[in-house]
Amino acid sequence: METGDSAVKSSQDVHYYGKSTAQKHRRSNGIILIFRALTFSFSLTSVIVMGTNRHRIDAQSRVAWYDFDPFRYVLAVNAIICIYSFVEIWLAVYTYLKDTLFLPETFQVWFDYGHDQGFAYLLFSANSAGIAMAQLLQSGNSLIHGAYRCSDAGVFCTQARASIGLGFGAFLFLALSSLLTGLRVARWYFS
């Protein structure tokens, strides 16, 4: 009797594509873990690149990332995303290894989705402000310390753009994570 019951149960669990619900959840959790790790890597690299962006223009003048508010915004938001992604990686590893959520399902599903959405918008906003400032500096419409062009500051503008580009990479993977957590919300809500 037990073997018959388990055969019926396993045939009900298998979807017509041949994957069980548990296998699909495990694969989904693995993909989310990869996206979280990529978000963390890109945001951490962006923080490092922007945080080390200091150059000497001449004997008396130096330019640094903290001289420009948009670049401060880029660094601060990428640091926040880095910390958030680290926590989410820990939660994703826990979920992947234990096959269960760390927090109650209702809370964790909405926590992940809401924070992914909010932080993705924040990250996009910061990078957009940063790229606008970098473009103004590069075009010469705004001068460094009111007197110097980007060409006078070595690789300062290029390094700022690289950091912002890495921030957009973090945004891409955070947006993909948000898409998957949104699907998780829909699956939870309609099941």
UniProtKB/Swiss-Prot annotation:
InterPro entries: CASP/CASPL, CASP_dom. It comes from the Eukaryota. This is CASP-like protein 4C3. GO terms for cellular component: plasma membrane. Homodimer and heterodimers. Belongs to the Casparian strip membrane proteins (CASP) family. Residues 51-72, 138-162 are extracellular. The keyword Membrane applies. It is a multi-pass membrane protein. It comes from Physcomitrium patens. It is found in: Cell membrane. The chain crosses the membrane at residues 30-50, 73-93, 117-137, 163-183. Residues 1-29, 94-116, 184-191 are cytoplasmic. Keywords: Cell membrane, Membrane, Transmembrane, Transmembrane helix. It holds the Pfam family CASP_dom. Disulfide bonds: none annotated.
